[in-house]
Amino acid sequence: MERIETRGLVLYNRNFREDDKLVKIFTEKAGKRMFFVKHASKSKLVASIQPLTYADFIVKINDDGLSYIEDFHQVQPFKNINGDIFKLSYATYILALADAALQDKVYDPALFAFLVKTLDLMESGLDYEVLTNIFEIQLLGRFGISLNFHECAFCHRVGLPFDYSYKYSGVLCPQHYQQDERRAYLDPNVPYLLDQFQAISFDELETISIKPEMKRKLRFFIDQLYEEYVGIHLKSKKFIDDLSSWGQIMKPRTENEETE
């Protein structure tokens, strides 16, 4: 087994036998790996194997079975996310989405950095719903999906009030709406924002300001895209959907919602 030191993000853990755990960690240097932790509740590793824990790990990598954690340091627990059920539910969802998008043992430092940066921005207080939307749109490529929100699929003009066509996996300008009678009939701001989401770099993102009604439209359409093109159904996503109903009782009203 190869011994390495790597940054890692705990995706989840689950019980194994009486007091052991299997811990799924997305590592920067070795991709996603499953680690075996014996007597987990009494182990010195217990603080490092909780979901949404980001740390430096010293590990032994086994390409033919379970890997092992030797030690850890510099733990970042994402306290703000863990202290808010709404942020936590969305963070848990993007962890599950990243897990679904990448096979185990595949080296993907770009996705690792993107996932960690998304969580950092959530932790800093940026809009977790919109950050999740951006993550979902940019992650489509990992599922082998390429969608065009930038230019008309026929005339290639840009900057127009586009609508989306599932038939052409891209947008249509008003002149070519008739090419697909079953187009999505979207608010033109939805494909406009998704085009921005595809291109944006989180290193440049400082503020997010999107009204609640537009966020609902984005959520609805991105759900349709994932159903049509990806077809995965994650438990963490269902929990988010449930939050949109009963969770509103607990959620503090934002300034935008109060002025609507």
From Swiss-Prot:
Keywords linked to the UniProt accession: DNA damage, DNA recombination, DNA repair
GO cellular component: bacterial nucleoid
Record-stated family: Belongs to the RecO family.
Keyword DNA damage: yes
Pfam families the record matches: RecO_C, RecO_N
Gene3D superfamilies xref list: Nucleic acid-binding proteins, Recombination protein O, C-terminal domain
Residue pairs linked by disulfide bridges in the UniProt entry: none
Superkingdom as given in the UniProt entry: Bacteria
Function noted in UniProt: Involved in DNA repair and RecF pathway recombination.
GO biological process, one term: double-strand break repair
SUPFAM superfamilies in the cross-refs: ArfGap/RecO-like zinc finger (SSF57863), Nucleic acid-binding proteins (SSF50249)
InterPro entries found in the cross-reference section: ARFGAP/RecO (IPR037278), DNA_rep/recomb_RecO_N (IPR022572), NA-bd_OB-fold (IPR012340), RecO (IPR003717), RecO_C (IPR042242)
Keyword DNA damage recorded: yes
Identification of the protein by name: DNA repair protein RecO
Coiled-coil stretches: none
